[in-house]
Amino acid sequence: FIFTNGSAEHAENILTHLGVYDLFGREKVFDIKDAGYIPKPEPATFDLMAKKFDIDPKETIYIEDIAKNLSIGYERGCATVWLINDELFGKMDSDKDYISHKIENLSLFLKEIRLLKSK
């Protein structure tokens, strides 16, 4: 599932660019509108998203490019993965204990965990 502080349309464009849109589609995107315009890492927003998609956080890998947004996933029991982002806002709090793993390439990571078929 995609959990974004952006619009669903923006998420669809990014997923298409990354070549993974077919894994998700619009029905698996929870955007800022779905969140009532209350952004991550607000706990109530995370809980609303988890309820909508019937997600058990303890069985979830939470991947995020803004390090501080991983805090709520960690608190709820997710395995957390920071997609390394060199922008100042993206890397703030990237040294915190709530980050389980750090990656540089999302597509490669998805292939490694067998969510994305190799071409």
Predicted regions and their residues:
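Conserved phosphate-coupling serine/threonine residues in phosphotransfer and NTP-handling enzymes
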Residues: 4-6
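Asp-based, Mg2+/Mn2+-dependent phosphohydrolase catalytic module
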Residues: 8, 14-119
